[in-house]
Amino acid sequence: MVLRAKCIYCGMNSPGTFDHYLPKEDYPEFAVLSMNLIPCCEKCNSKKGKRWKTDADSRIFLNLYYDLIPNVQFLFVTLAYHDQSHVPTVDFYLQLADSIDANLSSMITSHYEQLNLLNRFEDHANK
């Protein structure tokens, strides 16, 4: 049973599985290391797959056990009313401050893009 209330990658869904942040096929010595087992939802786990770094050795996904998230806002939302229904539409977007380290900024952007989080947040907000 996964003990966290929400997926550590998206923060929306209940975790139903564990992701091996470092793939167990490539790093069998870390296969059961608790810090390598990330409680996550099936959607994030399937989107992430076995990937964790680019061909240039840059990490693709945040690991909230190790990465220090900047203490500045980088996720924003715009609410708009476009018709007489009075139902707002939402538009989530990233705006990374120059004060955020370039490598971390790149990883944050990649994390949100690879997991399709901005679109998933919009879908979730419009339910």
List each language-model region with its residue ranges.
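Long, charge-rich alpha-helical interaction segments
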Residues: 84-127
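Glycine- and acidic-residue-rich phosphate-binding/metal-coordinating active-site segment common to enzymes
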Residues: 14-97
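Active-site-adjacent scaffolding segments
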Residues: 6-8, 16
